[in-house]
Amino acid sequence: MALEKPQWKELFSEVVTSGLCTGCAACVIACPHPVLDYETDNGVYKPFHLDIDGGPEDCTHGQKGCTMCTRACPRFRNWESEIDTHKFARERTEDEVSGIGDVLLARATDESLVENGQDGGFVSALLIYALENDVIDAALVSGLEGDGSTWRAVPQVARSREDVIETAKSRYTYSANLLAYPEAAEGGAERIALVGMGCMASAPGAMQSRKAGKLARRLCLTIGLMCSKTFDDSIFEELFEAKYGIKRADILKMNIKGVFQIWTTDGHFHEVPLKEAHAFTREGCKQCPDFADEHADISTGGIGAFGDWTLVIVRTDQGRELMNAMKENGLIETRPGDDDPGAVALLHRLAIVSRKRWPEAAVPGPRRIPVVITYPSRH
């Protein structure tokens, strides 16, 4: 009996149209032919096949044996166990609620990065160090289209300190940062970092565990951004402007700290209750089980009591080596995670909530209701 070679047809039925697809675009950049593209209109954020003569699920290359799209997908079949085993040499236990790793707090020592970045500028400091010290050649990040006044997040490539500073701060509409990969590779980058939420952070591990070729080898570092959800672009006109009179072109900075915090160019500060934003949740986020980007090398989140510190989970030896080098060079300062027990408790709570999203019918998959455990901090 021939071995099964799952291809686009299976990916289309089991992930793309089942509600499990997060829109990460891993399948699109992995397609070698290429016959996959990406839909962003009307908040769709999903891959589609360009040649639909035989139907949207048909792929003549898949029928001939091409499996690259299913190798790249971080939500296809037994993805969690496969990636856990590849990255950590074991599957997680049921009480490892937010994945495998050590929790601490970190911030940049460069005050200009703290001021320009988000929650202490840690991610900016990390990317700048990696770019300037021959760790990576480029990073896949998100930026804002045009002059930034639309606040539409778009995939971009960062190759320098200036690029990192330009693309700092958070956006809360979706950007499939993996779509910037072709630009980075065509520009000669062989060692590429991916910065993204859990939906994207599992993609390199999926590709590597399933041997997806040069693409898998190039994605050498993953920095995760903790995320409960992102929002449809319509939130700007239909909520912020319609109810609060905040025009997107006037927004200077946004953050989420229990409420939607919005700073505007006229110097004013606004708070929008999160419950009012729930109706604008992006479709691809509704069944995502990964708040804590559990397959990143380093996961980061601004969920603590200290607004200028980042909650960090260091998950791999590569992540630890990078953290140690930055500390030795005086580029970051760290504190034990136990300094902010509320942040650690919130991390666990949000991780549990997100894991419960994964539908029971979609098996195998993430364990739905794990037990809470507190990890020792490295400092």
Per-region residue spans from a language model:
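Short, charged low-complexity linear segments at domain edges
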Residues: 1-11, 29-55, 168-174, 254-271
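N-terminal basic/disordered segments at the start of proteins
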Residues: 11-29
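Glycine-/proline-rich flexible loop or hinge segments
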Residues: 44-59, 105-113
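Iron-sulfur cluster-binding cysteine motifs and their immediate structural context
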Residues: 2-3, 8, 26-48, 58, ...
